[in-house]
Every structure is written in C-alpha cells, then in structure tokens.
Amino acid sequence: MLVYENLKNNNVLRHFKQRFAQLDTLLNNPIWVKSPVIELGLNKQHSADIRKTDSLYWAKTAHEQLAVNRHNGLEVTGQVYARPDAYFDSENDDAEKASKYKAKIQAELGWNIINSKFYQGKEKRNKVALANELSRLQGKKRQTADIYEKAADDLTEQYNFYIGTVIAHRLDNLDIMNEAYQFMLEKDRISNDKMLKVMNEKLAAEYDISILCSDRDISNKPIYRMKPSKVLVDTAALWRHIDEESIDARIMMVKEQIADNDSKLTNYLGTTRITPFARWSSYWQSNNKISNNGDVGVRFTIPIYNESPRKRKALETEKEIIKSSRNTDVKEIKQSVNILLKRIENLNQAIATEAYHIDQTSKYIDMRRFAYQNQKQGYNYLMRMDEYTGLLESMERMYKLMLNRGLAIINIEKAVSIYDNNNIFKEIEL
C-alpha cells in the first residue's frame, strides 16, 4: 500500500496523463490469444506405463488360455506293490501258487473329459480372459485418476497468468487513483469513504496477484485480449459414452459378463467325473512266472445332490444386482452431469454478455478519448480512469468465467471417465 506525502497537483496530473497514454497504447495494440486448451490426456509416462501394464495382462491371458487349450484331460496313473504273504505260504499246490503273485505293476491311461478343454473349453477360456480384463480396467482407472487434477491445475495456471496481468494493470490504475485521492484528502476536497474504497480495492488486487501469480513476474506485461468463445456439447455422444464407453461402464459390463459366463459353467455335468480308461497290469506270480492282462472301462463319480440350479440362481441374482447398481450409478452420474451442463450453458451466456460489455466499453472509451482531448477547460481525470478500470474489470470477469467453464468441462470428463481428448466438447469463437 502506497502512502504519498507532500503531493502536488501537477505531479498527480502528469501521472494520470502518462497512464492514459500508456493504456491507450496497450488497448490499441493488444496481444490477442486463444483461450487456453484443456490438455486432458495421458502424458508420455502415463501412456508408457499403461501400454506396459496392458501388454502384461494380455500376455498373462495368452499364457493362461494356452494352458487351458493344452489341458486335454489325459491322465496317467500307475501303481507298484508287493504281497509279502506270497513268500510265506509254501504248502499250497502249484495251482494255488500260480494264482498268487509276489508283486504287481499297473499303468492306466484315463481321459477326464469333463475337466478338459473338450467340455466347455470356450467358457473356460472366457473365464480367464474376463478375469484379467477386469483387473486391467480397474488398474487403468487407478493409473488415470490424477490426469483430471493435472488438467485442472494446468488450465488454472494458464488462466491465472492472463487474469493476473489484467489485475496488475488495474492495480496500476488504482495506485494513481489512490495518489489523487490522498492529494484531495490533504486539500479537504474528498471524503474518507472514497479513499478507503480505493485502498480496499488495492489491497484486494494485491492479494489476488499474490495468490494467482506468486511465482511469476507479471510487471510491465502487455494487455492480453482473449477471444470470447462458446462451448457446444454433443450430449448424445456424452450419454452414449456414459452408457457404453466410460471405464466405469466397461468395468460393470465385464462384471456382468463374468457372472453370465460363470452361470454357463455351473451345471450338474460339471460336478461329475467321467473317465474312460485303458489299463495294463503285469504280475510276478508266486511260481516266478510273469502274467499280463489289459482291460478297458469307465470310471465315474456322480454326486447324489445337485446344487447347480441354486448356484445359477445366485449368479442370475448377482447379474441383476450388477445391472441395478450400474443403472443407479449411471442415473447419479447423469444427474451430476446435467447440473454441470446447465452451468456451462449459463457460463456461455455470461461470457457472451461480458464480451458484449467489453466491446461496448472499448467503443465508448475510443469515443470519449477524442472528447477528452478536445476539452480545453479540462475534465474529470478520476472519471476517465474509472472507465479504463471498468474495462479491465470486465476483461477479468470474462477470463474468470471462461476458467470456470473449463473446470466444469473437466469435472464432467472426470465424472464420466473420459481420459483422452475427445469430440464431445467443441469450442467456437463468438
């Protein structure tokens, strides 16, 4: 806060004239800039991490599905054992000795059809793929969670620079007005209220600059003129994205597919064990001869209860729970998005109004400039400075409105899990 002492009228007027000339030059030669773009996307590190994670999940799925494809159900079992009692019983005749054996070797090749790729192989491969896809999507959601905050920070930082430069120019105006009011106060030509009002505005402007541009030098910057714009929203594409393409929707769809696939795998036949087999046995008989024999058959295990219908009903209920949860989530998201869309619409209107006000004020200042120059008896310098300050305030308000609109767009993109640049939002100049 500047406090002036021993002010002279000529010095105050000279400062006004210098500032008016400076403002006229700046306003007639502004630096036109486009509104900052929302850079909502994955940076190189994000993209590399996600590509690596995706490739690992796909490799894991390929290996696990290959394991399913190689599971042909063939099983080899064998046994080797001896019968010690054959050595101790020596009083039996030769026929009895021939019917006994000292040792036995047996090998069996069985085909466990139910627990193989030949029975519901497609569903078994799908189970592997869906489980990995669910884990991949959930991991991707975690990996992309911070891009919205980063996009909001980047957008805010860009706007803060332009807002800060406008405030800095307004602060220069307030410094001169403060100087004039102090001079007038010394001469008892003004009330304290007007001076206090300017001093409070100066304090507020200085505070805003310290918050918005604490790490930037915004002194002696040009006036940046931002072209006003309107944001159009493709609501049909937005609703379609919420229903089908958002990462949350895809996660819920995969969960539903998992429940549906598990329902197909749940059946009575899947709980049985049916194993055709071929067996070869060799006996070392008690008369020291070797005998062989082979046989074929079917070994089966059949539960006397059937819990599959209950499990399928449980899975169908789970599917309904998933659908209900998804519908509830979508409804809540759409309600939040509708509020943000209404906010964007209101901000579009406010920006258009402020842009019109800037245009009209600029024309007014141009007309008044010639009027002031032609007034030989002088004019109200404070009133003229108020006109310039009003224009700067209007520019500041418009930039803040455009920033708030950009943040509303990012909030929508966060709510519906858009994590890359898209064509849902289109910005056009007014």
Question: How would you name each of these model-derived features?
Answer:
Residues I113-K117, G121-K124, Q138, R142, ...:
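Outer-membrane pore/translocation modules
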Residues N43-D49, S55-T77, R83-K127, K140-T144, ...:
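A glycine-/polar-enriched beta->alpha junction
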Residues M1-L42, D208, D215, S229-R240, ...:
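Acidic, low-complexity, intrinsically disordered peripheral segments
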Residues A249, M253-S263, L269-T271, T275-S394:
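Intrinsically disordered, low-complexity segments enriched in Gly and acidic/Ser/Thr residues
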Residues N9, E39-D49, T53, G121-V128, ...:
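Amphipathic alpha-helical coiled-coil segments and their boundaries
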Residues N6, N28-G73, N192, R216-A278, ...:
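Amphipathic alpha-helical coiled-coil scaffold segments and their short linker/junction regions
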Residues V128-A131, S135-S210, Q349-D420:
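Charged, solvent-exposed structural "stalk/scaffold" segments
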Residues K8, V12-I38, Y81-Q138, L174-A180, ...:
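A subset of solvent-exposed loop/turn segments in beta-rich extracellular surface proteins, enriched
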